[in-house]
Swiss-Prot record:
Glycosylation sites: 215, 269, 293
Broadest EC class assigned to this enzyme: hydrolase
Tagged with keyword Nuclease: yes
Protein name: Deoxyribonuclease-2-alpha
GO terms assigned for molecular function: deoxyribonuclease II activity
Pfam families xref list: DNase_II
Catalysed transformations (reactions): Endonucleolytic cleavage to nucleoside 3'-phosphates and 3'-phosphooligonucleotide end-products
């Protein structure tokens, strides 16, 4: 029995060697997926599992499904996709881990001048994936040799989007990062990788775009041909990502979900031809929901109410982030996932709001 159990566990955690791609909850490679980690209060059962449940959506989905297991497990999409990072044979890979709130270490870095941006690039000579997320202190450094989920990220909602790309697309992706100006806390970029991706080498060194325009939009094509639009801005752009650029670029009103327990929150904006509304409550379809308020949700996403766009990124709507780098990744096939989630939003009549910087919520960005 013990032998059979060991074999089953090995099969569950098996990732084919040389196949560097996003992996879905099914355990099979997928072109892309989105994971929505639910706030802690929406869980049930064992208290240790509360705050680790998630919803899942990928290229094959018609609706959100419950995640397999928990977000801190390598049986699920996020953990399984990141497994190659923590293997002993990862010397053949290139990776860049960035986060304005990196995992704790003895080396303290001031991230206030860097972009408000979080993500992972993981690639080999054939291609790899870009994981964009909202999770502080995540993922662990490669030297930890184990995947884990930060305990401090269990309480609030989080979003993660993973897209598999051919190697050539990382040229454009790395250039986008010169605008978002990420704080890189772990990387390996050696030999051919450094030569092939000079922009990525500049990013690792802490360099950024030096002249305007201070924003950049590029079309990216996944391994299976899905089209994504990447929007990136540097701090000198000096405006809100959503009302100052994205709504006009997409030609549509936006409903934006972001972290609303910080100072300087920007109210809904109806001053332009395209309006931008702050989402105040999110609800998953069905009688079981769940539903939760924006003050319980650290995720960053937006949707055009009448279609056809939805975006997942790493930027909030607040005054400080008008002057910081960051961005979002948009796609039309994401619209059917996010449109049903908006339950309530703030009308433009409300001029201002203020949330205290209480601990621990106010320490998050």
């Amino acid at each position: 029995m013990a032998t059979l159990s060991s074999l089953l566990l090995t099969a569950l955690l098996w990732v084919p060697v040389g196949t560097l791609t996003c992996y879905g909850d099914s355990g099979q490679p997928v072109d892309w997926f989105v994971v929505y980690k639910l706030p802690a209060h929406t869980g049930s059962g064992d208290a240790t599992q509360n705050g680790l449940r998630y919803k899942y959506f990928d290229e094959h989905s018609e609706d959100w499904s419950d995640g397999v297991g928990f977000i801190n497990s390598t049986t699920g999409a996020v953990g399984r996709s990141l497994l190659p990072l923590y293997r002993n044979n990862n010397s053949q890979l290139a990776f860049v881990l960035y986060n304005d709130q990196p995992p704790k270490s003895s080396e303290s870095k001031d991230s206030s001048s860097r972009g408000h941006t979080k993500g992972v690039l993981l690639l080999d000579q054939e291609g790899g994936f870009w994981l964009i997320h909202s999770v502080p202190n995540f993922p662990p450094r490669a030297s930890s040799a184990v995947y884990s989920w930060p305990p401090g990220a269990q309480k609030y909602g989080q979003t993660l989007i993973c897209v598999s790309f051919p190697l050539t697309q990382f040229l454009d992706i790395s250039k986008q990062l010169t605008y978002t100006y990420p704080l890189v806390y772990d990387h390996r970029l050696e030999g051919d990788f450094a030569q092939k991706f000079p922009y990525l080498e500049e990013v690792v060194k802490g360099h950024h775009v030096r002249q305007g325009p201070w924003n950049s939009s590029v079309t990216l094509t996944s391994k299976k041909g899905a089209t994504f639009q990447s929007f990136a801005k540097f701090g000198n752009f000096g405006d809100d990502l959503y009302s100052g650029w994205l709504s006009e670029a997409l030609g549509s009103t936006l409903q934006v979900q972001f972290w609303q327990r910080s100072s300087g929150i920007l109210p809904s904006n109806c001053s332009g031809a395209q309006h931008v509304f702050d989402v105040t409550q999110t609800a998953f379809p069905g009688p079981a929901g769940p539903a939760f308020n924006a003050t319980e949700d650290h995720s960053k996403w937006c949707v055009t109410p009448k279609g056809p766009w939805a975006c997942v990124g790493d930027m909030n709507r607040n005054q400080r982030e008008e002057h910081r780098g960051g961005g979002t990744l948009c796609a039309q096939m994401l619209w059917k996932a996010f449109k049903p989630l908006v339950k309530a939003w703030e009308p433009c009549e409300k001029k201002s709001r203020a949330y205290s910087l209480g601990s621990p919520a106010g320490l998050w960005t």
